[in-house]
From Swiss-Prot:
Subcellular compartments: Cell inner membrane
PROSITE patterns in the cross-refs: RCK_N
Domain of life: Bacteria
Full protein name: Glutathione-regulated potassium-efflux system protein KefB
Alphabetized GO MF terms: glutathione-regulated potassium exporter activity
Membrane topology type: Multi-pass membrane protein
GO cellular component: plasma membrane; potassium:proton antiporter complex
GO term, biological process aspect, one: potassium ion transport
């Protein structure tokens, strides 16, 4: 692809994403499906703006690479060791069982047994990019089903190595083309990467961080991710596996959060590019000429994988409410199928349109997953949001709550317990199935689902409630929910959690005046105690705390129109001088009155 063509392709990708994804979100079908539909629209079988799909698809795998690096940063080696049973137990069983069943079915459709084996293995793999994206959207990351799903995906990445090595053996060309010496050298190189990364990465990043130049740190992070991906690709291994290992090696370093911040913008954009590329690769010509075969294949593929995954989840002891989430999110074919089937085609394992049919099946199965997960959500909503069972004794028996609490993590739990201790009628909305199960055991009235859905808010009693307390983890969800409440339930008093100063500005701009910055009050309290330990009288320290709080809130309100402007810097300096003057005056006025005060804790 020429430089100008590459630039044009980039503009088209960005335009497709900007146009399709907001529309898809508005229609309620999700960003992933929006990317896929955008890819179909601009690809060779749509408007035909881009024809070189294979090259772009290979480049777009960098989105998966960046995602796996961030996941590696979140998992230290000890946590990875704890997952060994689910990785090598459930993960291995899923690949072997799914591959065996799917290979058997392919043999019934005139595939040679060698081609059927390769096809079964390729179809048994799931899409790492899509599954992880959907797990994050559904709040599954910390749930039992989410952890098990990640373990299965990790084993699938490990299975790439033997799967690719198996292709020349099945093609009967092992003696001519399969060099065991090269395999040994690749294994040694891989081990060398592990050892080198273990002892070299932290000193290198310590040296780079000492320069104090943020851009250099970002460049070094990109070099690490792209370099490890290129190294693994040269070895014929999974690029995503290489960057995942690099992330794990740095998971316990002091640079973990800085690395994640540097990578995050690239991850999101490249993941979108990957999904658009998958949509572009959909061969509508093959779909048109073999429509019945493809439709049946997609249904059978998804059904077989759901069956295998559901049974394994049951054997592993996953709660019944989480099994369908686990099975549904991994039910599609994956990006590895494109690599494996291309390798098999070069070895002449496939005949006629067999490879094209398999790739169309994989692509369409990926498009069904967001829709399938919406159906799973509706099913779970009916299961959990129906009438209470007779043997349950919830805290709230009235269907008209006074308060709706959205999100019941550590922040929301404190609020909920305080309200319930004072006999307030509350209803909780939570999208983490594990949390829903736990709360119901303790008698909380809780609804499962996405609180940004108006119907769920109505069924939870929003039309009769007096207040709503929003404690979402994601700022985007908070702002979306504020907008929905103001539009559909204007009578509600909105109280919200702000993760930081920027979100506090956004809430004020949206008209929400009752909010709490999650670390501000606790930091102020600890600061007051620090002043006392440094010799300040407890009463004086309390007054200092109150003055600081008032001045900070005043600054927050004054700077709403320019919260992204450099004017904040000079205003902050003025506020600090003003605060110092207030403290000095009060210290002089109150010095005589402090002798009768004791520590008030």
């Amino acid at each position: 692809m020429e430089g100008s063509d590459f630039l044009l392709a980039g503009v088209l990708f960005l335009f497709a994403a900007v146009a399709a994804v907001p529309l898809a979100s508005r229609l309620g079908i999700g960003a992933v499906l929006g990317y896929l539909l955008a890819g179909i629209a601009i690809g060779p079988w749509g408007l035909g703006f881009i024809s070189d799909v294979d090259e772009i698809l290979h480049f777009s795998e960098l989105g998966v690479v960046f995602l796996m690096f961030i996941i590696g940063l979140e998992l230290n080696p000890s946590k990875l060791w704890q997952l060994r049973r689910s990785i090598f137990g459930v993960g291995a069983a899923q690949v072997l069982l799914s591959a065996a069943l799917l290979a058997g079915l392919l043999m019934l459709t005139d595939f040679a047994w060698q081609a059927a084996v390769v096809g079964g293995i390729g179809l048994a793999m799931s899409s790492t990019a899509m599954a992880l994206q959907l797990m994050r959207e559904k709040g599954m990351n910390r749930s039992e089903s989410g952890q098990l799903g990640f373990s299965v995906l990790l084993f699938q990445d490990l299975a790439v190595i033997p799967a690719l090595a198996l292709v020349p053996l099945l093609a009967g060309s092992a003696d001519e083309h399969f060099d065991w010496m090269k395999v040994g050298m690749k294994v040694l190189a891989f081990v060398g990467m592990l050892i080198g990364g273990r002892y070299l990465l932290r000193p290198v990043f310590r040296f780079i961080a000492a320069s104090g130049v943020r851009e250099v740190f970002t460049a070094a992070t990109l070099l690490l991710v792209l370099g490890s991906a290129l190294f693994m690709d040269a070895l014929g291994l999974s690029m995503a596996l290489g960057t995942f290992i690099a992330g794990v090696l740095l998971a316990e370093s002091e640079y973990r959060h800085e690395l994640e911040t540097a990578i995050d913008p690239f991850k999101g954009l490249l993941l979108g590019l990957f999904f658009i590329s998958v949509g572009m690769s959909l061969n509508l010509g093959v779909l048109y000429t073999h429509l019945l075969w493809v439709v049946i294949s997609v249904v059978v593929l998804v059904a077989v994988k759901i069956l295998v995954l559901y049974l394994l989840a049951r054997l592993y002891g996953v709660r019944s409410s989480e099994r369908m989430q686990f099975a549904g999110v991994l039910s599609q074919g994956g990006e590895f199928a494109f690599v494996l089937f291309s390798t098999a085609s070069s070895q002449r394992l496939f005949q006629g349109d067999q490879m094209a049919l398999l790739l169309v099946t994989v692509t369409l199965s990926m498009m069904t997953t967001p829709l399938l997960m919406k159906l799973v959500d509706k099913w779970l909503s009916r299961q959990f949001n129906g009438p209470e069972e007779e043997d349950e004794k919830p805290w709230v028996n009235d269907d008209k709550p006074q308060v709706i609490v959205v999100g019941f993590g550590r922040f929301g739990q404190v609020i909920g317990r305080l309200l319930m201790a004072n006999k307030m009628r509350i209803t909780v909305l939570e999208r983490d199935i594990s949390a829903v199960n736990l709360m119901r055991k303790y008698g909380y009235k809780v609804y499962y689902g996405d609180a940004t859905q108006v119907d769920l808010l109505r069924s939870a009693g929003a039309e009769a409630a007096e207040s709503i307390v929003i404690t979402c983890n994601e700022p985007e969800d908070t702002m979306k929910l504020v907008e929905i409440c103001q539009q559909h339930f204007p009578h509600l008093h909105i109280l919200a959690r702000a993760r930081g100063r920027v979100e506090a500005h956004e809430l004020l701009q949206a008209g929400v005046t009752q909010f709490s910055r999650e670390t501000f009050s606790s930091a102020l309290e600890l600061g007051r105690k620090t002043l006392v330990t440094l010799g300040m009288h407890p009463h004086q320290a309390q007054r200092a705390q109150l003055h600081f709080r008032r001045l900070d809130m005043r600054m927050l309100r004054e700077l709403i129109p320019m919260h992204a402007d450099t004017v904040q810097i000079s205003r902050a300096r003025e506020a600090r001088r003003e605060l110092e003057e207030i403290f000095q005056r009060e210290m002089q006025q109150e010095r005589r009155q402090l002798d009768g005060w004791d520590e008030f804790e």
